[in-house]
Amino acid sequence: MKQLILVSFLIVFNTNAEDQTNIDALLDGLHEDAHKGNFEAYFDRYSLDAVFLGTDKTERWNIQEFKSYAKPAFADGHGWTYEVIERNWEGSGDTYWFDEILFNEKLGHCRGTGVVQLINNEWKIKHYALTMLIPNSIAADIGTQTQQAE
């Protein structure tokens, strides 16, 4: 019985470690493809029914809408660049969720959050949301500016 429990634990641990490696590769590749302007490779990382949320309140796109939005940014061989500072994720089986702190020269620190799912033995991004990180000390001022801009 102890051996069965140990074997079960090792299988789960190994699977989780392998999943984590594959998910990190998926997300690292996403950011690398965006940086290099690899449109097809970038969007191949998303599921066919993926949703992307951008930083503006109007930016809720299905994958086809997101492709239309992003195409001009990728047209010159450059997409956008976000450096990964830190990443956390949770989950098991065929679904994981993550959050990552990113840095962009224009927007500063941002947070990407999302859900990935194993589809036909390949990890795909089902949902991704990008938000700007605002220090609490200036949040009220930013809130006022946001309301004025609307």
Feature names for model-found ranges:
Residues 37-49, 53:
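Short, well-ordered alpha-helical segments enriched in acidic and aromatic residues
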Residues 46, 56, 86-88, 101-104, ...:
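A mature extracytoplasmic/lumenal domain signature
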Residues 50-61, 72-78:
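A short gly/proline-enriched turn/hairpin at secondary-structure junctions
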Residues 113-122, 146-148:
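Short beta-strand segments and strand-loop junctions that repeat across beta-rich extracellular domains
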Residues 127-150:
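Low-complexity, intrinsically disordered terminal/linker segments enriched in charged
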